[in-house]
Amino acid sequence: MSKNIEHTMQFDLNKTKEALTKAILTEVYDSLQQKGYNPINQLVGYLISGDPTYITNYNGARALVRKLERDEILEEVIKSYLEIK
C-alpha cells in the first residue's frame, strides 16, 4: 500500500472479478482432472446446460463454481481468449 496519502487510490472491481473467476476455474479444473474427468468437456457441459452435476463435488468444486454466474464465467473466458482487457 502506498504511503502517499495525497493521492486517491482506485479500486478496480473488474480486476478483482477477473482474478476471482480465474482462481475458481483453476480450482475446479484441477479437481475435475484429479477425479479423472476431462475438465474442458465438463466445464463446457456445465456452461451450456447450467447443470451443476457436470462438476464434481470433490474439493468443493461444485460449490465453488456456483459462486459465479455462468455468463460472467463466459465473459471472462472470452476476454481472456481474445486478450481483451
Curated annotation (Swiss-Prot):
**Which branch of life, at top level?**
Bacteria
Q: What is this protein called?
A: UPF0297 protein CLL_A1175
Using the record for this protein, list the coiled-coil segments as residue ranges, or answer none.
none
* Similarity-based family: Belongs to the UPF0297 family.
| Xref: HAMAP family | UPF0297
Species of origin reads Clostridium botulinum (strain Eklund 17B / Type B)
Q: Which InterPro entries match?
A: IreB
